[in-house]
Amino acid sequence: MQNSEGGADSPASVALRPSAAAPPVPASPQRVLVQAASSNPKGAQMQPISLPRVQQVPQQVQPVQHVYPAQVQYVEGGDAVYTNGAIRTAYTYNPEPQMYAPSSTASYFEAPGGAQVTVAASSPPAVPSHSMVGITMDVGGSPIVSSAGAYLIHGGMDSTRHSLAHTSRSSPATLEMAIENLQKSEGITSHKSGLLNSHLQWLLDNYETAEGVSLPRSSLYNHYLRHCQEHKLDPVNAASFGKLIRSVFMGLRTRRLGTRGNSKYHYYGIRLKPDSPLNRLQEDTQYMAMRQQPMHQKPRYRPAQKTDSLGDSGSHSGLHSTPEQTMAVQSQHHQQYIDVSHVFPEFPAPDLGSFLLQDGVTLHDVKALQLVYRRHCEATVDVVMNLQFHYIEKLWLSFWNSKASSSDGPTSLPASDEDPEGAVLPKDKLISLCQCDPILRWMRSCDHILYQALVEILIPDVLRPVPSTLTQAIRNFAKSLEGWLTNAMSDFPQQVIQTKVGVVSAFAQTLRRYTSLNHLAQAARAVLQNTSQINQMLSDLNRVDFANVQEQASWVCQCEESVVQRLEQDFKLTLQQQSSLDQWASWLDSVVTQVLKQHAGSPSFPKAARQFLLKWSFYSSMVIRDLTLRSAASFGSFHLIRLLYDEYMFYLVEHRVAEATGETPIAVMGEFNDLASLSLTLLDKDDMGDEQRGSEAGPDARSLGEPLVKRERSDPNHSLQGI
């Protein structure tokens, strides 16, 4: 190599341009890397440099082994080289991968602030002109990309990737580098650097890069808003927050995932850290947990006869497993949200009384049915507790379609030592037993206990956030129950089928209601935690004319005005205190207790509870109507809160009635499940209660044919009727 005389002391370099005096350059594949000085004496000559190695010119500019502050340009040339300025140094370029000596301590790429990225085996296709946290590189070799939150180890030609979680806090240099790039690219002023530092550190503490994983964009922003609210920080808008994320996790992609009409934008390549406190909170879980497992580990359920055609190229073919294996993978993530310690209650004994058994049916058969049905229900509990919902159909088919011979019966159930003949019942014997009214009533009560236990296992707390995958699995399970049971009992008498399906229908309806309530709770939680929305709701609520609402609703509901005023004041006070969802739930529970305590122990308790629900719903609809007519800015928030509180009131009243009657909530809701078979005796009891209350009101009120409350508004000396 020869250096020019004039440019030896100049640190800068400029791109070379051909001069008029330069001879033509012959066509040659030879490549020369030239670095020129910016200031050279006139007349300085450039010596031609011949390179022994001939390289093919790639279409994309490749980085060299070192990065210099000056510009670098590739010049095609042979023996003659452009003489525009004095040439300082010329370097050969070799595009093939080069191995660096382990003893070398020089880094390949040095970024401002002390951050460092080390690449082994080969160079990436391009080096960005700016340095941020988490640079993603992907080549045919095996580069190791070091970032603040994780180490991504890229493989070779098969492009397989694995992530190693790195949970240590980011260094100050890393954060300074990200802030510096944000200031350059977005024009962020320096006085906001402290605020950005808090935001970026929170991102690095709670999230990490991971291949094959995505999170809803809205969930990340909701987590960020919660963080700002807890630490009294001013949040940035959603667009600026997206730039914050991309400044921390380079190479992050955006995908639109979900079903048609219900899709949402997701960040692909990021997930919550396992030790992040957001895993326990999950205040906004509408879609958050859907992508917490890598996508290639969740193959879609397909029929068993098509499993041979499943598979993928390479090592991924073994990941397409059976539905049982898929459920096992999902259940590992969902076990923490269900009550696996639930104790299955004992069944009562059938009350035969003086009932005469049919020919061919003995007490021994009844005892065998008790044992078999108990084991069948225990197996159902085990399957649901393991979240293997698809096994329920097989269990029902096996139990209700046992063969005519005992040897062909449900042999999967072990025989009891107390039953020497084995705890099996042939199908014809089972049909005969179910046709006995005491046996059918006993089986119905057992089903109430069973399905109530399943509800408490799957949804132990209706307000606790659960992953949307678990919620959707429960709803799909509820949707299939009636069809599965009807198909399994197709050969049984219609009365038996109606009795069994009526209970399972109440169970399915309860699952749908509770999952909907849980969904509303998570949506309302974000509203109740938003200070500005709460203030707007309180301002709009103070404009509502509650005197007019009471005037219109009193004729229908006949409620005490003092009770309505107290509820109004308590509601405003709870809203003003910015209470959490759990505090609101406690307040609603106290309202139910206060209203229904006067009916405790009375046969009219269920009727009073239902009337309270109707009155609560009517009053709330009147308030919503007033907000609508006033074009309240917080109408959407009030509508969401109203839906949640109505549904939660239903849940509370349902359990209070079950407690008062000694039944399970499933039994209470199953009472009116079939509108075609409403209990006329229950309706008669309600009518009798109305007549008794009418007689207590006096002959004047009955003669006017007008509710008591409407008349008494003109008589302040008369006490108003209670709820």
From Swiss-Prot:
UniProt region (Disordered), positions on chain: 1-46, 292-332, 688-723
Polar residues bias locations: 322-332
GO BP, one annotated term: acrosome assembly
Result of altering E110K: In a breast cancer sample; somatic mutation
DNA-binding region per UniProt: 199-274
Keyword hit for Transmembrane helix: no
The UniProt record lists the keyword Transcription regulation: yes
Modified residues (Phosphoserine): S28, S416
Keyword set, alphabetical order: Cilium biogenesis/degradation, Cytoplasm, Differentiation, DNA-binding, Nucleus, Phosphoprotein, Spermatogenesis, Transcription, Transcription regulation
A GO molecular function held by the record: sequence-specific double-stranded DNA binding
Bias (Low complexity) ranges: 10-20, 308-321
Localization per record: Nucleus; Cytoplasm
Source organism superkingdom: Eukaryota
One CC-aspect GO term: chromatin
Major subcellular location class: nucleus
Family in the record: Belongs to the RFX family.
Subunit structure: Homodimer; probably only forms homodimers in testis. Heterodimer; heterodimerizes with RFX1 and RFX3.
Annotated function: Transcription factor that acts as a key regulator of spermatogenesis. Acts by regulating expression of genes required for the haploid phase during spermiogenesis, such as genes required for cilium assembly and function. Recognizes and binds the X-box, a regulatory motif with DNA sequence 5'-GTNRCC(0-3N)RGYAAC-3' present on promoters. Probably activates transcription of the testis-specific histone gene H1-6.
PANTHER family: DNA-BINDING PROTEIN RFX2 (PTHR12619:SF17), RFX TRANSCRIPTION FACTOR FAMILY (PTHR12619)
Name of the protein described by the UniProt record: DNA-binding protein RFX2
